[in-house]
Curated annotation (Swiss-Prot):
It comes from Giardia intestinalis (Giardia lamblia). Gene3D superfamilies: Hormone Receptor, Insulin-like Growth Factor Receptor 1, Chain A, domain 2. This is Variant-specific surface protein VSP4A1. Keywords: Cell membrane, Glycoprotein, Lipoprotein, Membrane, Palmitate, Repeat, Signal, Transmembrane, Transmembrane helix. GO terms for cellular component: plasma membrane. It is a single-pass type I membrane protein. It comes from the Eukaryota. Residues 682-687 are cytoplasmic. It is found in: Cell membrane. Residues 15-660 are extracellular.
Length: 687
């Protein structure tokens, strides 16, 4: 998920898991924690343990690799929810095992030994080193806001950043408090006034930002209608802004939602307001020159009461501007403004901008003629130098770049992509992108930044495709993975998502999918009349979730380790798994994992089917960790995690070779004995 130098603490100790996060299914209620930019789980549902912040099945490859065991070193069992001890290369922290070499572990600890952290990452400022010798293993690093007493050492409630206690015991020294609180002392973060989102003190006039719906004015949070007279309510910053911020001579003002800027309405000192096309508002001299300015975008009314935009046609007679005009001149009374340049897409002809250029042209030499464009609108480029037709940046049939949204082209240079379409992933430099595979099958990316495209569907060839899980527009919802306002028979689809589906459909990641239409057919081949999948696709890349009802997701990808909830139980796939069988149903609110039967990327399932590992030895049936075999093929036996021929001893010689050597040795020894007998007996008689 791109880090910055400063990490904002988003959570508090023992916090609820984020609803759209990675742990809502597998983590116990209120057992999530946010460390830097990462949400981690500190206690999993029964049958799972935290490894690098994620809940993994107790018998998984990840748990084995981390050396996760009970505190006494004995093996985990199906009742496990946390790790009590970690192996080499990992350290114990808040019930989980973490690596120092990768995130989120690297944001907690820099050096570890024997399964414990020996040097915490204190420069992050949200964690400190326990100077005492903790009796509870895993308490070597403490979060600033963790108030659990660990041998007399603890954090400070609601503290965001801190340093270790001055002595070996006591609370941390808080340097900054969380939102909604302020630093009352080095060891106390006190609550702000209820009006404030953030504050510098407890009073209602010590706010630094406000709760939703209120505006900050003179350090107090007020209603929008009180931002009046010499202030305007800025809907972007949620503050009451003084008119003098726009210009020292601005007397009254308002907020222009079209430009998201303040607009001066009246000025002092005999000046008049001037607001340009981009929304910049100032007070200028009451003169033709003052209104015209350096950009020539405005002209003065003949009664000298206001500056008007060149394209403003609301006034009458000589004060009427020219429709679609960008710049103009007006030097005296008794004459209307003269347009000198039109807005993009309009052609200036005999002082008028009423005739448009051809489609996609910003400026042109002839109106409506497509090959007379001089400058193209954003998203298009000139087909030939000088002037010509404007071609879409993504039109590959005419020299465009696949997936490109905006581009540039020098007269003698190649076409370069500067921005990819929302559903494409950019690669390369920002002035010459290659727009790689789709990040979302919906061209709108499910409504842009307010939508989500997290529904992963695996096709018949094993390729992942991303479909809509949440639609940004309130009147749309995901049907067959794309946002639409046509729900058909799916009455359970309302604003943004679907909560249940009709017969012939099934619910998957917030959307309804048909069983006989791609992409739904990749996942399910048969569903009940209640809209529940009961038979997965024959490719076994998905499994049916046991005992799911219509309001629950009834199918899950074999490789989805984040899982889904059905009947209060967590059902998860296996990371890297391509084919699997469904787990048995649970009834205790715990975690059940699919049994993996085939893996991606040349890996093999472990013997238990709960993990995929690199297992390159052709004579090994399954590995417990990368390159560590746990079961060999017939004719081979285990020797320190490797498979050796059952007819081979540790010297590397086969039994046949050993037998041959033995026979040869017997012959040699027999010959030697015979020779000695002859020597001592026969030679003795001869003498």
């Amino acid at each position: 998920m791109l880090l910055t130098a400063f990490y904002v603490v988003l959570g508090s100790f023992a916090a609820p898991c984020q609803q759209d996060g990675d742990h809502i299914v597998t983590c116990q209620v209120n057992k999530c924690e946010t460390v830097g930019l990462f949400e981690i789980c500190t206690e999993c549902k029964t049958g799972g343990v935290p490894v690098d912040g994620f809940c993994r099945p107790f018998g998984s490859i990840q748990a084995a690799a981390a050396g996760c065991t009970k505190a006494d070193g004995t093996a985990l069992d199906k009742t496990a929810t946390t790790c009590g001890k970690c192996g080499d290369g990992y350290f114990l922290f808040m019930g989980g095992c973490y690596k120092t070499e990768s995130q989120p572990g690297s944001e907690i600890c820099t050096t570890a030994s024997n399964g414990l952290c020996t040097a915490c990452k204190v420069d992050s400022q949200y964690i400190f080193q326990n100077k005492a010798t903790p009796s509870e293993k895993g308490s070597e690093c403490i979060l600033c806001w963790d108030t659990t007493d660990r041998n007399g050492v603890m954090g400070v409630a609601n503290c965001a950043t801190c340093t270790a206690p001055a002595s070996s015991t006591g609370p941390a020294t808080c340097t900054e408090c969380m939102a909604g609180t302020y630093k009352k002392s080095d060891t106390e973060c006190a609550a702000c006034h209820s009006d404030c989102a953030t504050c510098s003190g407890e009073a209602n006039n010590q706010c630094t930002s406000c709760e939703t719906g209120k505006y900050l004015k003179s350090n107090q949070c007020v209603e929008k209608n009180t931002c009046n007279t010499n202030h305007y309510p800025d809907d972007t910053s949620m503050t009451c802004v003084a008119c003098t911020v726009l210009d020292a001579n601005c007397a009254t003002c308002s907020f222009d939602s079209a430009t998201a800027k303040g607009k001066c309405l009246t000025c002092n000192s005999n000046k008049i307001p001037r607001t340009t096309l981009d929304g910049t508002s100032t007070c200028v001299e009451n003169s033709y020159a003052g209104c015209q300015g350096a950009d020539n975008e405005l002209f003065m009314k003949e009664d000298q009461s206001a500056c008007l935009l060149c394209g403003d046609t609301k006034e009458a007679s000589n004060d009427k501007g020219v429709a679609n005009c960008r710049t103009c001149t007006k030097n005296a009374n008794d004459s209307p403004p003269t347009c000198t340049a039109c807005l993009d897409g309009y052609f200036l002809e005999r002082g008028s901008c009423t005739t448009t250029c051809a489609d996609n042209c910003a400026t042109c030499s002839e109106a409506t003629t497509e090959d007379k464009c001089k400058i193209c609108k954003a998203g298009f480029f000139l087909a030939s130098p000088g002037e010509g037709k404007c071609i879409s940046c993504s039109d590959t049939n005419n020299g465009g770049i696949d997936g490109c949204a905006e581009c540039t082209k020098e007269p003698a240079g190649p076409l370069k992509c500067t921005k990819c379409k929302p559903n494409r992933k950019p690669a390369g430099t920002s002035d010459n992108y290659t727009c790689t595979e789709k990040t979302c099958e919906d061209p709108t990316v499910c409504g842009g930044t307010s939508g989500a495209c997290d529904a992963i569907v695996i096709d018949a060839n094993g390729k992942e495709h991303y479909y809509c899980s949440y639609c940004g527009e309130t009147n749309k919802f995901p049907i067959d993975g794309l946002c639409t306002d046509n729900k058909g028979t799916n009455a359970g689809c309302t604003d943004h998502t679907c909560s249940y589906c009709a017969a012939g459909f099934f619910l998957y990641m917030g959307g309804c999918y048909k069983i006989d239409t791609v992409p739904g057919s990749y996942m399910c081949s048969k569903s009940t009349t209640a809209g529940v999948c009961d038979t997965p696709n024959a490719n076994n890349r998905f499994f049916v979730v046991p005992k799911a009802i219509s309001a629950e997701q009834s199918v899950l990808a074999c490789g989805n380790p984040l899982g889904t909830i059905a009947g209060g139980n967590a059902y998860v796939g296996v990371e890297g798994c391509s084919q699997c069988t469904a787990p048995d149903a649970r009834a205790d609110g715990g975690m059940a994992v699919a049994t993996c039967t085939a893996c991606e990327d040349g890996k093999k399932p472990g013997k238990s089917g709960t993990g995929c590992v690199a297992c390159p030895d052709a004579n090994c049936k399954s590995c417990t960790m990368d390159d560590v075999c746990e079961e060999c093929a017939d004719g081979f036996s285990l020797d320190n995690g490797k498979c050796v021929s059952s007819g081979t001893n540790k010297s590397g010689l086969s039994t046949g070779a050993i037998a041959g050597i033995s026979v040869a040795a017997i012959v040699v020894v027999g010959g030697l004995v015979g020779f000695l007998c002859w020597w001592f007996i026969c030679r003795g008689k001869a003498q």
